[in-house]
A protein has these predicted regions:
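A surface-exposed partner-binding patch
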Residues: 1-111, 147-245
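Compact, glycine/acidic-enriched structural inserts
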Residues: 113-150
Length: 245
């Protein structure tokens, strides 16, 4: 289903929360043409056509109960807090605990996706959905009994699984990889780095982004969804703990 049709079909739909409260999503006011121009000027490139279409329809979807929060925001565009991972991002949703679902925005973007879950506890990056339409459908599923599906899997299971997994490949093991991208990326990184190839990720796949503390160095192979993180000594981590640097 197209994103526009999904958004229109969501408005007015009855949802049942975890506390058995009934909520109804409503469309926010559309974003003005002047605001869209302002967003594109800030980005330095045109908004993806699908996003522009949605913004002229509604700035987002909100619920009748303000305490439940705004589940979907189509206009939340800013620089990613992890600039070594993503540049400009749309944050369509947060979990209320400081963790965000984000979509990287790029010039000439045909698909408004994928959607990633950026979590700080544990500090991981997790693949959520291939596009915003799928994410919205999954989010609606999560907001209705039995409250299951990909969103619940990522929040309740994948974060822990990604934090504890050992699938990240030491940079030294890819110096002579048959994959040109991985080989070039590995040779550009210092010793002690680990690489995670998420080009063909499935919901729940991901990479720890704070394996060696809050200042863990991160890198990305150009525009590809191939990421890496560097190791830090115990002394370096202790310095960060006491000084924040």
């Amino acid at each position: 289903m197209k994103l526009k049709d999904l958004v229109l079909g969501t408005a007015g739909r009855k949802l049942i929360t975890f506390d058995d409260e009934e909520l109804t999503p409503v469309l926010q006011q559309p974003v003005s043409h002047a605001r869209i121009v302002e967003l594109e000027r800030k980005l330095g490139f045109a908004l993806p056509p699908e996003l522009r279409e949605i913004l002229t329809l509604a700035a987002g979807l909100e619920l009748e109960d303000p305490e439940f929060g705004d589940p979907i925001d189509f206009a939340g565009i800013d620089r990613c807090g992890y600039e070594d991972l993503f540049g400009w991002t749309l944050t369509p949703c947060t979990d209320g605990a400081g963790n965000d679902w984000v979509i990287e925005l790029r010039p000439d973007q045909e698909v408004l996706g994928p959607v990633w879950f950026l979590c700080h506890d544990a500090p991981v990056l997790v693949y959520q959905s291939p596009d915003l339409a799928t994410f919205l459908a999954d989010n609606l599923r999560y907001l209705q009994p039995p409250h299951d599906g990909p969103i619940r899997h990522v929040v309740e299971h994948a974060v822990h699984d990604v934090w504890t997994q050992k699938l990240d490949v030491p940079r030294a093991d890819l110096l002579e990889s048959q994959d040109p991208l991985l080989r070039t990326f590995a040779n550009a990184l210092p010793e002690g780095w680990f690489i995670r190839d998420l080009r063909h990720a499935k919901p729940g796949d991901g990479m720890p982004i704070g394996r060696f503390g809050p200042k863990t160095p991160l890198a990305r192979a150009g525009d590809e969804f191939v990421f890496a993180y560097g190791s830090r000594s115990r002394l370096e981590r202790l310095k960060t703990f006491f000084t924040g640097k």
